């Protein structure tokens, strides 16, 4: 955790105490995430770290033996070598295939360099010292960042007067898709996107958690979000008699959709690097964020990067 980042965002809006502790639902059975002693107890009934380690090591050996001395060639082989068959098949395989729209045997091994495993009973998804969500939601943070700054929405940068931006500024901060900036001159990058189906449930507490991942193909969506758990805790959950839930669906990006995630396969990584080389020649343009750098970023590292550039 970066205290400078935490202090900066809290200077704009106060953050609450939310910590992400997702639950996985595999065919009606629940497992805590990330992989920790609670998960291993739910999976095998083991009570001690040594029992859990023995179970995973046994399954890892089977996976390594199947490779017969060669390196893992795809995500499935890599994951099996890291956590074994049970965790892979119930919590990784089908969820990953829904996320990426590809079989695990078709995804490159390097997507999963490592899978964090905790030998303690700890469901806190992140290890960061500072965690939370802006009180009132992220709109409060964005409004605070833009305070006193002229902001125009609904403007297509590439089909407006601002395309000739040097009339207005010495430098441009560009956060759109890097391939679009260069007119797709080297080809189009692939993206994944998500869509949501949101509804109101006539119950104060629908699933008891902010995030529940659905890790089997039997359910078409990847997860269900119950929004009130981001901001309401304890008895406050029941003070509001209804709740808003969203089903999240992962799909292939098509023109007109909003791109969310870069596709980290060999073709796209090579193409993205070629675009980054073009970007380096644009001395008056700062390419920042997921779309402009074609990299998956969490929020804190992006803010840290911005502070290093401008503060």
What spans do the regions from the language model cover?
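Conserved beta-strand segments of alpha/beta enzyme cores
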Residues: 14, 150-152, 284
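C-terminal catalytic lobe of FAD-dependent flavoproteins
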Residues: 258-311
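Active-site/ligand-binding neighborhood in enzyme catalytic cores
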Residues: 20, 24-34, 38-171, 182
């Amino acid at each position: 955790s970066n205290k400078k980042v935490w202090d900066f965002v809290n200077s704009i809006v106060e953050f609450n105490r939310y910590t992400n502790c997702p639950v996985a639902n595999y065919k009606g059975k629940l497992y805590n995430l990330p992989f920790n002693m609670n998960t291993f107890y739910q999976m095998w009934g083991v009570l001690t770290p040594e029992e859990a380690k023995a179970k995973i090591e046994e399954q890892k050996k089977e996976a390594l033996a199947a490779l017969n001395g060669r390196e893992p060639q795809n995500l499935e082989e890599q994951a099996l070598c890291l956590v074994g068959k049970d965790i892979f098949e119930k919590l990784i395989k089908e969820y990953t295939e829904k996320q990426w729209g590809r079989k695990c045997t078709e995804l490159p091994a390097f997507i999963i360099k490592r899978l964090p495993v905790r030998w303690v009973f700890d469901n806190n998804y992140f290890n960061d010292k500072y965690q939370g969500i802006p009180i009132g939601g992220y709109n409060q943070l964005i409004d605070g960042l833009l305070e006193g700054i002229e902001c125009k929405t609904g403007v297509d940068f590439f089909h407006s007067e601002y395309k000739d931006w040097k009339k207005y500024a010495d430098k441009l901060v560009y956060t759109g898709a890097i391939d679009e900036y260069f007119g797709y001159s080297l080809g189009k990058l692939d993206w994944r996107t998500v869509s949501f189906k949101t509804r109101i449930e006539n119950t104060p507490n629908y699933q008891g958690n902010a995030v529940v991942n659905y890790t089997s193909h039997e359910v078409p969506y990847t997860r269900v979000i119950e929004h009130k758990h981001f901001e309401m805790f304890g008895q406050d959950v029941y003070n509001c008699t209804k709740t808003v839930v969203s089903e999240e669906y992962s799909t292939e990006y098509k023109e007109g959709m909003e791109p969310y995630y870069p596709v980290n396969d060999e073709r796209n990584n090579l193409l993205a690097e070629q675009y980054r080389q073009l970007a380096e020649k644009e001395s008056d343009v700062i390419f920042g964020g997921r779309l402009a750098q074609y990299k998956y970023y969490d929020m804190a590292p992006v803010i840290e990067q911005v502070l290093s550039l401008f503060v």
